[in-house]
């Protein structure tokens, strides 16, 4: 969808195409504001079609395989209520680049990715920083992301928070 920022991602990739030699950008998700054809046309127009693979929606094991086999998950979103895809990515130990449209400021505290302003330039800098981050440090970022999700969003923790909220209201 347009609020997911796929256009911003593609523009950022186009700006630094030479620095991303050997990298593949996989765009997954159900069609909404953009169709697979429109995304492929955008990649052609930006001269990045050789490094962009638009796969459409992924479900079940295919979705989890994509998260777990990715080096980084990028979501330059306009706004998210939560951003379940960020949590899912972290559960696979994959670091995240997302924008401040997602309520994930704790990314900075946990040092498990990049939480940036939603601009092409900011995304460009974050991608470059990611590419230049040593593999072991990226792996540790992903593990810290997994720890973040387990500490903040495990079902028993969320249930306790709901009970506390309920008790504070009555």
Predicted regions located by residue number:
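Aromatic "clamp/platform" in nucleotide-sugar-dependent glycosyltransferases that forms part
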Residues: 78
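Short alpha-helical donor nucleotide-sugar binding micro-motif in glycosyltransferases
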Residues: 57-58, 65-70
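Glycosyltransferase donor-sugar binding loop
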Residues: 24-38, 56
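Short hydrophobic beta-strand element within catalytic cores of glycosyltransferases
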Residues: 95-99
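A conserved mid-protein helix/loop that constitutes part of the nucleotide-sugar donor-binding site
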Residues: 1-15, 25, 37
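Conserved acidic donor-binding segment of nucleotide-sugar-dependent glycosyltransferases
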Residues: 114-121, 129-135
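A short, well-ordered alpha-helix in the C-terminal region of glycosyltransferases
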Residues: 136-152, 161-164
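Nucleotide-activated donor-binding/catalytic signature segment of Leloir-type glycosyltransferases, i.e.
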Residues: 37-58
């Amino acid at each position: 969808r347009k609020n997911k920022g796929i256009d911003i991602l593609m523009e950022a990739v186009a700006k630094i195409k030479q620095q991303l030699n050997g990298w593949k950008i996989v765009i997954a998700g159900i069609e909404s504001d953009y169709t697979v054809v429109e995304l492929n046309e955008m990649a052609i127009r930006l001269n990045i079609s050789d490094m962009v693979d638009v796969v459409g929606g992924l479900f079940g094991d295919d979705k989890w395989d994509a998260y777990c086999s990715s080096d980084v998950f990028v979501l330059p979103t306009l706004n998210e209520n939560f951003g379940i895809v960020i949590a899912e990515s972290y559960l696979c130990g994959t670091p995240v680049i997302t924008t401040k449209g997602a309520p994930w400021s704790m990314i900075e505290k946990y040092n498990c990715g990049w939480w940036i302003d939603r601009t092409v330039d900011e995304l460009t800098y974050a991608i470059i920083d990611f590419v230049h981050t040593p593999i072991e440090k990226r792996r540790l970022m992903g593990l810290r992301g997994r720890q973040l999700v387990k500490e903040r969003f495990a079902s028993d923790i969320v249930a306790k928070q709901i009970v506390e909220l309920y008790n504070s209201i009555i």
